[in-house]
C-alpha cells in the first residue's frame, strides 16, 4: 500500500476537510486515488467527477506542480506524495 495526502482549499476545504490521508494500492495513479477519495468523502464525487470522468475545471496539484486530468491518469503515486485540490477559479 502507498500512503498519500489529499489537501483541499477554498470551497473544497469546506466540503471535504483540509487534509485527508489516503492509502491506495501500490502502482495507483493520481486518478485512482481521486476515485478512492470520492468513495470515502461523500460530497467529493459530485464535485470532482461527471459521468465517471474527472471534471476538467478542477485545479489539481501533484507534489506542488499543476497537472490536468490526462496527467492524473498517468502519474503513479509513491509514499508521501501530495495531491492538492482547488475549486474552479471564478469572479472578476
Placement of each model-derived feature along the sequence:
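Ubiquitin-like/PB1-type beta-grasp interaction modules and other compact soluble beta-rich domains
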Residues: 1-91
Amino acid at each position: 500500500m502507498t500512503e498519500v495526502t489529499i489537501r483541499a482549499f477554498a470551497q473544497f476545504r469546506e466540503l471535504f476537510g483540509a487534509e485527508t490521508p489516503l492509502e491506495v494500492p501500490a502502482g495507483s495513479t493520481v486518478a485512482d486515488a481521486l476515485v478512492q477519495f470520492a468513495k470515502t468523502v461523500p460530497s467529493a464525487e459530485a464535485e470532482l467527477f461527471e459521468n465517471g470522468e474527472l471534471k476538467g475545471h478542477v485545479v489539481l496539484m501533484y507534489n506542488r506542480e499543476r497537472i490536468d486530468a490526462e496527467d492524473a491518469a498517468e502519474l503513479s503515486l509513491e509514499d508521501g506524495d501530495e495531491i492538492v485540490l482547488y475549486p474552479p477559479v471564478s469572479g472578476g
